[in-house]
Amino acid sequence: MRKTILPIAFAAALAVSFTVSPVEKADSKKAITHTIVNNSSAAASTTVATAEATALSIYERLELDKLGLSVDAMKYAYKGYEQLREKGALANSDVLTVVDFSQSSRKKRMYIIDLKNDKVLFNTYVAHGKNSGLDYANQFSNTPESLQSSLGFYVTKGTYSGKHGLSLRLSGQEKGWNDNAEERAVVVHGANYIGDHRVSSAYMGRSFGCPAVPQEYAEKVINLLKDGTCLFIYHPSSRYEQESTLLNG
């Protein structure tokens, strides 16, 4: 049989083609990897945009601007709420409560929102800590005995009867910002130093750091909030906005 001898140049070309092919495949894998990473980033951005759009929709439908709620307070509240809900931290995800400390203490700055039925359940006064400020709260702390309010997200727990009557325990969800809430006995309770009868004063009565509500509405508020709902205490703090793990998660 006659043997066919390949030209040296052709053989060399074949060798080069077989050498190059694996490199091209490796580059393809890198391209796929980068695509997956980029898609993940895009998905995260989409999630944030969706949460903000939902928050704005709720804000507009319920006309929360007419009740004095800051639009930023609502946007941040809903974003963190979504993070907690997705983590399974909320036993009751139907209710979201926003405390807007950008407002005067003489304003009704607690908003209890029924997300399931799309309505405001209650809007009332809420006290800030005595060392957080007079009419406006502007100092915040997570330190025991500071007598200041703490910013951020909380998950409500069970109730108990204490020196202020029916009270609601709170679990702070943000390390360094409010995770000492239980150690500090920061709870929702009723108080006679806050309410309509104090509106004409220079400022409402203040607490030792608790988000206290008017005594006559304490039972109603606590029963709406108890057992695993989300409570968010807001103030326009750039440091908190940058450091919050729930806002930046």
Label the model's feature ranges.
Residues 1-32:
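Bacterial Sec-dependent N-terminal signal peptides
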Residues 29-207, 215-224, 229, 240-249:
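Cell wall/extracellular polymer interaction/catalysis modules
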